[in-house]
């Protein structure tokens, strides 16, 4: 046994001597290549990987395990960084307050354009020929002959039809074109929304708590007496003292609707149901009429009330979360770009954005799948342990 051990030791010493001689002859680049190869071999060894994992698990058993293992003096410096982060959040809050001031300032500049939009939609103003000229995209351009033919056809149709005023059902069409809004609109809501003339957004004044109001302007109708229905959203743009690191810009904290003065028998947010009840003793049957809530877009103006404690049940929380999303979408997208949602162009742009991301993901998946299905594919050839992407 001793002779075998001595022989193995001798062979090992010889191997080491050979390695030393080779290393003396190799260039620095060759040494790097060998180091890479050795690293690859080590990382493919299950025993080595298991040992490394065990060591890492012991060092960092929880996400904060490493932080807890730091010396006290280092922890103090980390706390200093956290205090700096809080100050960054406070500056960011100030930034968003100034953005809100800019929104209010530019809302005044946008308003004359929105006023003219309102007048065109509601047949108060008839745009001139020059204002109606629109150069289509290159792919939409057609020959002069086809243009003339289309013009003649349009004139014939206009003669056959009664002359429409403004742009009929403008806002209803916008709502029906947008999934987020069309899901709210029921069939019994549509006749009412045909009377919707305009939607406006009003920002809180300087020095007031951050908020905005959505105004829905209606023409006189047979359903309610209100000329304007409002929805007010209260916002906060400051870090929460209890969790300052969660601050990520202004957030909607609550909302208030308005009372709709429905005309008799026209309240679409309620419905009457009839229920038969059988008397247990006598066996007689009676019909009971009961009024219950009904799905409707106009429930948007009666959001759940948030108690002072702030505690809400799951249903109320879900309703408010959806409500906030809708309010934000109306303010940021629908009101400024309504004509593009009316024509569907804004929706196509949104779909294109999602399609591009989806196509990229699909292409990546196809490439990976092709490699795996290729019998000649060798995953080791793709490994490059020398590269390290910087985050």
From Swiss-Prot:
* GO BP annotation list: nervous system development; nucleosome assembly; positive regulation of neural precursor cell proliferation; positive regulation of neurogenesis
Recorded domain comment: The NAP1L motif is required for the histone chaperone activity.
Residues recorded with modification Phosphoserine? 10, 69, 143
Q: Which residues carry this modification: N6-acetyllysine?
A: 116
Processing and modification events after translation: Polyglycylated by TTLL10 on glutamate residues, resulting in polyglycine chains on the gamma-carboxyl group. Both polyglutamylation and polyglycylation modifications can coexist on the same protein on adjacent residues, and lowering polyglycylation levels increases polyglutamylation, and reciprocally. Polyglutamylated by TTLL4 on glutamate residues, resulting in polyglutamate chains on the gamma-carboxyl group. Both polyglutamylation and polyglycylation modifications can coexist on the same protein on adjacent residues, and lowering polyglycylation levels increases polyglutamylation, and reciprocally.
What ranges does the record give for the region Disordered, renumbered to this chain? 1-32, 132-163, 346-391
Keywords from UniProt, A to Z, are:
Acetylation, Cytoplasm, Isopeptide bond, Lipoprotein, Methylation, Neurogenesis, Nucleus, Phosphoprotein, Prenylation
User: InterPro entries, per this entry?
Assistant: NAP-like_sf, NAP_family
The similarity annotation says: Belongs to the nucleosome assembly protein (NAP) family.
Quaternary structure annotation from Swiss-Prot or TrEMBL: Homodimer. The dimer binds strongly and sequentially to single and double H2A-H2B heterodimers. Interacts with ERCC6; this interaction increases ERCC6 processivity. Interacts with RAD54. Interacts with SETD1A.
Q: Which residues form the propeptide?
A: 389-391
Q: Which residues carry this modification: 5-glutamyl polyglycine?
A: 359-360
Modification N-acetylalanine, positions = 2
Which source organism does the UniProt entry give?
Answer: Pongo abelii
Task: Tell me the lineage of the source organism.
Answer: Eukaryota, Metazoa, Chordata, Craniata, Vertebrata
Q: Which residues carry this modification: Phosphothreonine?
A: 62, 64
Q: What is this protein called?
A: Nucleosome assembly protein 1-like 1
Motif NAP1L motif, per the record, lies over: 125-150
GO cellular component terms, A-Z: cytoplasm; melanosome; nucleus
- The Cysteine methyl ester modification is found at 388
Q: Does Lipoprotein count among this protein's keywords?
A: yes
- Renumbered to this chain, the Acidic residues biased-composition regions fall at 11-28, 132-143, 346-376
Q: What does this protein do?
A: Histone chaperone that plays a role in the nuclear import of H2A-H2B and nucleosome assembly. Also participates in several important DNA repair mechanisms: greatly enhances ERCC6-mediated chromatin remodeling which is essential for transcription-coupled nucleotide excision DNA repair. Also stimulates homologous recombination (HR) by RAD51 and RAD54 which is essential in mitotic DNA double strand break (DSB) repair. Plays a key role in the regulation of embryonic neurogenesis. Promotes the proliferation of neural progenitors and inhibits neuronal differentiation during cortical development.
Motif Nuclear localization signal per record, residues: 273-279
Query: In which compartments does the protein localize?
Result: Nucleus; Melanosome; Cytoplasm
Task: Give me the stretches of Basic and acidic residues compositional bias.
Answer: 1-10, 144-163, 377-391
Q: Where is the lipid attached (S-farnesyl cysteine)?
A: 388
């Amino acid at each position: 046994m001793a002779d075998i051990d001595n022989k193995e030791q001798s062979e090992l010493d010889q191997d080491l001597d050979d390695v030393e001689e080779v290393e003396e002859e190799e260039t620095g680049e060759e040494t790097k290549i060998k180091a890479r190869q050795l690293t690859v071999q080590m990382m493919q060894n299950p025993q080595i990987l298991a040992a490394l994992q065990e060591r890492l698990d012991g060092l960092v058993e929880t996400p904060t395990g490493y932080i807890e293992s730091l010396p006290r003096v280092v922890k103090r410096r980390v706390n200093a960084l956290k205090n700096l982060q809080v100050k960054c959040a406070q500056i960011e809050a100030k930034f968003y307050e100034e953005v809100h001031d800019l929104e209010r300032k530019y809302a005044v500049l946008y308003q004359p354009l929105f006023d003219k939009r309102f007048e065109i939609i509601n047949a108060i103003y008839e745009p001139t020929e020059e204002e109606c000229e629109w150069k289509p995209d290159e792919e939409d351009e057609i020959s002069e002959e086809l243009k003339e033919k289309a013009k003649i056809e349009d004139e014939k149709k206009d003669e056959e039809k009664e002359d429409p005023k403004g742009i009929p059902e403008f806002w209803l069409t916008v709502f029906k074109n947008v999934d987020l809004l069309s899901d709210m609109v029921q069939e019994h809501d549509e006749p009412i929304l045909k009377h919707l003339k305009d939607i406006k957004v009003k920002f809180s004044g300087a020095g007031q708590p951050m908020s905005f109001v959505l105004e829905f302007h209606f023409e006189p109708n047979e359903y309610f007496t209100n000329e304007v229905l409002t929805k007010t959203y209260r916002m906060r743009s400051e870090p929460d003292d209890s969790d300052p690191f969660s601050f990520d810009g202004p957030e909607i904290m609550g909302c208030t609707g308005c009372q709709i003065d429905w005309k008799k028998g026209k309240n679409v947010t309620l419905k009457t149901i009839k229920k038969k009840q059988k008397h247990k003793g006598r066996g007689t049957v009676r019909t009971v009429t009961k009024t219950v809530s009904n799905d409707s877009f106009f429930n948007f103006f009666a959001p759940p009330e948030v108690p002072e404690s702030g505690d809400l049940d799951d249903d109320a929380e879900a309703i408010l979360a959806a409500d906030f999303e809708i309010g934000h979408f109306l303010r940021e997208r629908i009101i400024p770009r309504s004509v593009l949602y009316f024509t569907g162009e804004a929706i196509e742009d949104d779909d294109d954005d999602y399609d591009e991301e989806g196509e990229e993901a699909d292409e990546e998946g196809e490439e990976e799948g092709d490699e795996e299905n290729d019998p000649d594919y060798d995953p080791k050839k793709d490994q490059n342990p020398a590269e390290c992407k910087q985050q």
